[in-house]
Amino acid sequence: MSRAFIIDPTISAIDGLYDLLGIGIPNQGGILYSSLEYFEKALEELAAAFPGDGWLGSAADKYAGKNRNHVNFFQELADLDRQLISLIHDQANAVQTTRDILEGAKKGLEFVRPVAVDLTYIPVVGHALSAAFQAPFCAGAMAVVGGALAYLVVKTLINATQLLKLLAKLAELVAAAIADIISDVADIIKGTLGEVWEFITNALNGLKELWDKLTGWVTGLFSRGWSNLESFFAGVPGLTGATSGLSQVTGLFGAAGLSASSGLAHADSLASSASLPALAGIGGGSGFGGLPSLAQVHAASTRQALRPRADGPVGAAAEQVGGQSQLVSAQGSQGMGGPVGMGGMHPSSGASKGTTTKKYSEGAAAGTEDAERAPVEADAGGGQKVLVRNVV
């Protein structure tokens, strides 16, 4: 048993409490000075990044507002850093103070320990005197240690509360920063999506316009091609209007009571020999237009049959007229399908043949009967004059 049977356990208790206060020198917050320097440098750069007088307008104001928000954010972070440094420093001082108090109490007990040991050598009452001496010193030392520890606990609680406040403020700043960043990112994403949607919309509108133009061009091309094709077929003979053309052609050869395919001319078209087409080489003339009229030929042929052929030039002329009349009669009978002679016309009646005398009241033979009339030049209608000699 130790002679300082009260002081020694007290010193051991103080050493245990001292060990609970940590080993080494408490950190004074020097680890946070580097971050504080970073924040201060960022603040200086942000302050220099504000738009000057050469940049005005809404864009400059918007940039200045964003820059001011960043400055405020870094300024608050720097303030939090300073407060945290101060808090850590205060807590470190409290720990160091508590250590010092415990160290002083321990040293005080160690200082009186030899006295307590010496008192134990007094016979009979030495241990009682030593105990009475050690007890007040140990109680005092433990009171001081208890006070130091209480101070440390209170200081720690205060600093912890301040730390929680700083952490809450830091969380708020970080949340605001994240919200700002998220807002910026959301704005960027929104703007990007808006631009992408606008691009897609414009692209779709452009494709629609291109499709409309393409369909319009193709439709116009087919329309013009179809029109050109119709015009082409319309311009080709026989493809359009063929039926109407054939009907007109067949109508030219139609006759009453006869088929249009028989190829016979209509009887009304032969009413006058002057309307017949010219046939070169017939009778030595230029066509039927050069022949005398049918009435003249009929009269000449009738009178030629009642009288013998005259001699001389007059007879030759009459024969020529008779030959032409026979040719006309043959042509008429072939073209009209009627009786031979004078294009289907009937010869004069027997009454006209039986009349051999006539009294003239006009011309050179006026007032004479059974007289021979002088020759008369008759115009045949085709520009050719025919000498006709009428015999009474």
From Swiss-Prot:
One GO term describing the cellular component = extracellular space
> What does a knockout show?
Deletion mutants fail to secrete EsxA and EsxB, and are as attenuated as ESX-1 mutants in virulence assays. Bacteria no longer translocate from the phagolysosome to the cytosol of host (human) cells; bacteria replicate in phagolysosome. Host (human) cells no longer produce cytokine IP-10 (CXCL10) upon infection, but continue to produce IL-1 beta (IL1B).
As for subcellular location, the record says: Secreted
Q: Does the keyword RNA-binding apply?
A: no
Induction of its expression: Transcriptionally activated by EspR. Repressed by the MprB/MprA two-component system, by direct regulation and via EspR. Up-regulated by the PhoP/PhoR two-component system, via EspR.
Q: Where is the signal peptide?
A: none
Q: What does it do?
A: Required for secretion of EsxA (ESAT-6) and EsxB (CFP-10) and for virulence. Involved in translocation of bacteria from the host (human) phagolysosome to the host cytoplasm.
Stated name of the protein: ESX-1 secretion-associated protein EspA
Organism source for this protein? Mycobacterium tuberculosis (strain ATCC 25618 / H37Rv)
Q: Which gene encodes it?
A: espA
